[in-house]
Every structure is written in C-alpha cells, then in structure tokens.
Amino acid sequence: MKNATSANRSGLSPLRRLTRDRFGTTAIEFALVFVLFFVFVFGIIEYALMMWRWNSAETATQMAARLAVQSDPVSGGFNSYSGVADAGLGPGQSITLADVAAFTVTCSSDGTDVTCSGSGLPAGFSAAADAEGIVTFDNVVTEIQKLLPTVTEQNVIVEYSHIGLGFAGRPGTDIVPLVTVRLTNLQFDFIILDIFLGVLRGPGGAPVTDSITMPAFTASLTGEDLDTSGI
C-alpha cells in the first residue's frame, strides 16, 4: 500500500514541477505587454497624423476659397449676366434680392468634365461652365493639392450664391456672389492599427480601423474682382 502511494506521488511530481515552473514567464509577459504598448504608441501616432491631415484640409479649403474669389467664376453666367439688359435695372442700381431672387450655382467635376447647375436661376442666366471657368476650377484643385496631393477633382465643389450684392453695370460681374469651396469625401486610411486590430470586424465585415471618412470641409468668402486677369 505504501509502495502504491509512493508511486502515485512519484507520477504526479513532474506535473507539479511543471505547474510551479516560472522559467520563461518574463518573456511571455513582455510579449503580451509589448503588443499592447506597440498598438497604443502607433495608435497615437496614426491619430496624430489624421489630425494633421484634418487641419491641412481646413487650411487648403481656405486657400482655395481665397483663390476662387479672385478668379473668373466657374459658371460663365456670372460674366454674361447683365443687370441692365436682363434684370431691367438702371446703371449703378443695386441688385438686391428683391430685384433678383436668391439662387445658388454648384460646380463639380467627374474627373473629366466640369459641370455647373442651379435652380431658380434668373432669366438670361446660364449656369454652364465656360473655358475660363474650367481653368479656375483646375486652379482651385491645384491649390488644394499643394497641401493634400491625393485630392482629386471629384473631391472638390465650388458654389456661387447670390446674396443680394452687386449693381447693374459693375465692372466684371454685375452680381457679386458668395463663393464657397467644399472638400468632400476625404478619407484617412489607417495602416498600423488596421494590421493589429483588423480582426475586429464592423458591419459588413470591414475592419473597424480600415479608414475614416472625414466630414466636408467648407470655406466661404464674398466675391472680389472675380477676374483672373485682375482687371
């Protein structure tokens, strides 16, 4: 009986030694902590890069709006519309909202063509983009690309809104619009976080850290000379 008990103890001793063995625990603990530390540090770096891109987008939009108010309108109608001939006003008479109702012309690009459209346009006003306007649109995109090289024409929208400024017979455009530049559908793609946390799936099976679509960035200024030549 004593021999059997001794044999049982002898058989369990390797298991007990294994459960009490502490060799290698430091390496395991280091590996676990290092992964979390690595994700934390590079997560901070990537979010810092995202905020830098966010601020760059805001600044680029403001720069583009500043350029747009000093350039030919993308919509050729602002150059051709006459407060005298089309609205029946006397030379020098202000073009108020009572004379010409508020309207907005929106210009965008599909990557090939620049198009402008609007609703409630006054009689005699054509929203279509002209040659000078297409140059302006391209220049606006180029201005944004100085800070954000990955931006394309499809990300940019230029709007012109009649807000009751201008006068008949004014040099340049009779109507002085509020010019708005919008930067849309700008995305920031995560790299490090996507690698380490990509196993966490969001709706549709996409990695939750894959990318973030930023909100639209908008900058508006009242039109100035609206003439690239400065005349």
Per-range role (PLM):
Residues 1-23:
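N-terminal leader/signal peptides at the extreme start of proteins
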Residues 13, 46, 208:
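Generic anion/oxyanion-binding catalytic loop in active/binding sites
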